[in-house]
Amino acid sequence: MTKTYGVDVAVYQPIDLAAYHKAGASFAIVKLTEGVDYVNRRGPSRWTAPGLTTSTLMPTISRSFGSSVSRAKKEAAYFLKEAKKQDISKKRMLWLDWEAGSGNVVTGSKSSNTAAILDFMDAIKAAGWRPGLYSGASLMRTAIDTKQVVKKYGTCLWVASYPTMAAVSTADFGYFRQWTGSPSGSLPVTAWPGRRRERCSG
């Protein structure tokens, strides 16, 4: 089984990814847009490092559409417009970040939430990229029909779940084959406090 580490890079973290690669990361996920009025000007097209190629720097969208299909369409259009503007490689996955916060209402029905999520992912697929879905383990159990998502898009879930708030320096690769470090300044991947469970191959 391939063992893979990656980093989820926040906007306040260093733009030089060489240190992350040196610490063992083979992919990075970087925020591109949020809603329909924010673009990360330190986005994926500006991040480079030896070993972290155009196919392993993957943009995300932070959402605020909740269970609204019409809102999901607008956010997808905004996201894709920026992805094209930044000339994001079609080899990369584009990720939908659907979780509580930033105005995103997660209290809709599981079916309506899933319909909006799939509509967003469908737009990514139609534009020529492979879509992925990021959310917390709790929401994936209670608010999203992940079976329906996986049935349509295969291995595409990035699951946020922390086994403990204490530092975790090794990942359980018997559980998932890819892991990302949690955000904590510029600490090496192997020293970050906690791991996000990862089910998606890049």
From Swiss-Prot:
Tell me if Lipid metabolism is a UniProt keyword of this record: no
Q: Its domain of life?
A: Viruses
Record keyword Hydrolase present: yes
Kindly identify the residues recorded as the active site.
D8, E99
Family, similarity comment: Belongs to the glycosyl hydrolase 25 family.
Q: Which UniProt keywords apply?
A: Antimicrobial, Bacteriolytic enzyme, Glycosidase, Hydrolase
Q: Which Pfam families match?
A: Glyco_hydro_25 (PF01183)
The role this protein plays is: Helps to release the mature phage particles from the cell wall by breaking down the peptidoglycan.
Quote the SUPFAM superfamilies the UniProt record gives. Answer: (Trans)glycosidases
What protein does this entry describe?
Lysozyme
Matches recorded under InterPro entries: Glyco_hydro_25, Glyco_hydro_25_AS, Glyco_hydro_fam25_subgr, Glycoside_hydrolase_SF
Q: Which GO terms describe its molecular function?
A: lysozyme activity
Catalysed reactions, as listed in the record: Hydrolysis of (1->4)-beta-linkages between N-acetylmuramic acid and N-acetyl-D-glucosamine residues in a peptidoglycan and between N-acetyl-D-glucosamine residues in chitodextrins
**Class of this enzyme:** hydrolase
Record EC number: 3.2.1.17
Give the GO terms filed under biological process for this record: carbohydrate catabolic process; cell wall macromolecule catabolic process; defense response to bacterium; killing of cells of another organism; peptidoglycan catabolic process
